[in-house]
UniProtKB/Swiss-Prot annotation:
Keywords: Isoprene biosynthesis, Manganese, Metal-binding, NADP, Oxidoreductase. This is 1-deoxy-D-xylulose 5-phosphate reductoisomerase. The lineage of its organism: Bacteria, Pseudomonadati, Chlorobiota, Chlorobiia, Chlorobiales. Coiled coil: none annotated. Its EC number is 1.1.1.267.
Length: 384
């Protein structure tokens, strides 16, 4: 039996993970849960999955959770980013599902790695912000880092059984989001209601906006660089509106191996949890005859400059990826709060990157310093 701690248990990935666990209670147990926003949902999860430790956002949420649980149902309750780290390193778990949204997931994930836990990584920002540090820690601690993002899971599966030297490049697919065919002038007027209508995937608000700007794909390019040791010029992106081909690997003989499946995050989650085996995930079986047509097109870097910004950050290295991510988080939050327009998101990121004097970070604190600087700078651009 594999014992799990789930960071971000009440979010989209967390709920899908628990659905997989629910289907395979003979294979998985839950040791720890961490959430940031929905104490009532966490209380129900505690009653069903009986973790020994949970973390909530702050002391008030901890008090509220205690009132929702009887003494018999009550696990150890901790709070804050330190609490999430305690859950991540909790004794008794052997795998941590890292699904906290944004750079907030970095520190708990590092604590899990240092505690010798295998990582099922849904929090791409961990590698975007501190890819070199995290990669080094994974090697030093002898743990496995298994991708949960559908694209990286597809690449991981498409690489199995092949020699690294035979790989020509990897190709990430992107749905194109809700504005794939929207003229730029109309995109400038788009509000959160339009941007949150993803044509294929059901996800949280932040990642849905990132998909609409194509920043999500840019972050995935940086994540792929660290996961698969692939330089930027050997990572491609192609828009695939049907979201059936999840990504591809091109080999030097001209052959391309791809992984296909219905657009449902439970499939890559089940694969990461069960690896190297496979488990039934509850995902609808793929019927290609019913789908009929699969199409592909080049991404439009003019209408979606966030993707180019991510490639630029990856190529420049140093603290640029951390700054890219932090500025984007601030800009997306401002857009969701209707403080800025849709196209202002990429503009804010661009301005913040241009204002940054990059350096080579060595320690976690140096990555966090760049993250904080970018948040403050992006906030200043937005308020002005």
């Amino acid at each position: 039996m594999r014992a799990l701690s789930i960071l971000g248990s009440t979010g989209s990935i967390g709920l899908s993970t628990l659905d997989v666990v629910r289907r395979h209670k003979e294979s998985f147990s839950v040791v720890g849960l961490a959430e940031g926003h929905d104490v009532h949902a966490l209380a129900e999860q505690i009653k069903e999955f009986r973790p020994t430790i949970v973390s909530v956002r702050d002391e008030n949420a901890a008090d509220e959770l205690k009132t929702l649980l009887g003494p018999a149902d009550r696990p150890e309750i901790v709070h804050g980013i330190e609490g999430a780290g305690t859950v991540a390193a909790a004794e008794g778990s052997d795998m941590v599902v890292s699904a906290i949204v944004g750079a907030a997931g970095l520190t708990p994930t590092i604590k899990a790695i240092k505690a010798g836990k295998d990582i099922a990584l849904a929090n791409k920002e961990t590698l975007v912000v501190a890819g070199q540090l995290v990669s080094d820690l994974v090697k030093q601690n002898g743990v496995e880092l298994l991708p949960v993002d559908s694209e990286h899971s597809a690449i991981f599966q498409s690489l199995l059984g092949h020699r690294a030297e035979d790989v020509e490049r990897i190709i990430l697919t992107a749905s194109g989001g809700p504005f794939r065919n929207t003229p730029l002038e109309e995109m400038k007027k788009a509000g959160p209601e339009q941007a949150l209508k993803h044509p294929q995937w059901t996800m949280g608000a932040k990642i849905t906006i990132d998909s609409a700007t194509m920043m999500n794909k840019g972050l995935e390019v940086i994540e792929a660089h660290w996961l698969f040791n692939m330089p930027a010029d050997r990572i491609g992106v192609v828009v695939h509106p049907q979201s059936i081909v999840h990504s591809m690997v091109e080999y030097r003989d001209g052959c391309v191996i791809a992984q296909l499946g219905s657009p449902d995050m439970r499939a890559p989650i089940a694969y990461a949890l069960s690896y190297p085996e496979r488990s039934e995930s509850g995902v609808k079986k793929l019927n290609l005859a019913e789908i009929g047509t699969l199409t592909f097109e080049e991404p439009d870097m003019v209408r979606f400059p966030a993707l180019q910004l991510a490639f630029d950050a990856l190529k420049a290295g140093k603290t640029y990826p951390a700054v890219l991510n932090a500025a984007n988080e601030i800009a997306v939050a401002a857009f969701l709060n209707k403080q800025i327009g849709f196209t202002d998101i990429a503009d804010t990121v661009d301005k913040t990157m241009q204002a940054h004097e990059a350096y080579t970070p060595m320690e976690l604190d140096e990555y966090i310093h760049a993250d904080r600087w970018a948040r403050q700078t992006a906030s200043t651009f937005i308020s002005s």
